[in-house]
Curated annotation (Swiss-Prot):
This is Small ribosomal subunit protein uS8c. GO terms for molecular function: rRNA binding; structural constituent of ribosome. One of the primary rRNA binding proteins, it binds directly to 16S rRNA central domain where it helps coordinate assembly of the platform of the 30S subunit. One of its GO terms (cellular component) is ribosome. It holds the Pfam family Ribosomal_S8. Transmembrane segments: none annotated. It is found in: Plastid, Chloroplast. Its main location: plastid. Disulfide bonds: none annotated.
């Protein structure tokens, strides 16, 4: 059993990208599903689907690669910020811009999981889950 499902998912995605896999299997949790929805909406992954096997389920994520250079993935860096031992919370004014707006910060708010720019526009803060660029 994994204590931090977000770190596990990010590590699986990172390893699949390094190995240039087309798809990767990730454990099914609500937070993982919501993070993948944000990644799909932002164009970092193609899509994902929910599959059930016996009592447990998993997410099958289709990775997206650059259309010009098939070796270059759309996801290059996945950095976990908040962790179980040290949660990182921010107010609206302190939400960081990742790489000057090139990357995204994924934030868990009271309104759900969203990017940092959307949370900033809505005027709500939350827990910074990870940075992606």
């Amino acid at each position: 059993m994994v204590n931090d499902s977000i770190s596990d998912m990010l590590t699986r995605l990172r390893n699949a990208i390094c190995a240039q896999h087309k798809v990767v299997q990730v454990p099914l949790t609500n937070i993982n599903k919501n993070i993948l929805k944000v990644l799909q909406k932002e164009g970092y992954i193609k899509n994902f689907e929910i599959l059930f096997e016996r009592k447990s389920g998993y997410l099958l994520v289709s990775l997206k690669y650059n259309s010009l250079n098939q070796d270059k993935p759309c996801l290059s860096v996945l950095k976990k910020i908040s962790r179980p031992g040290l949660r990182m919370y921010v107010r609206t004014k302190k939400i960081p811009k990742v790489l000057g707006g090139t990357g995204i910060a994924i934030i868990s708010t009271s309104k759900g999981v969203m990017t940092g720019s959307i949370a900033r526009n809505l005027g709500i803060g939350g827990e910074i889950l990870c940075y992606i660029w």
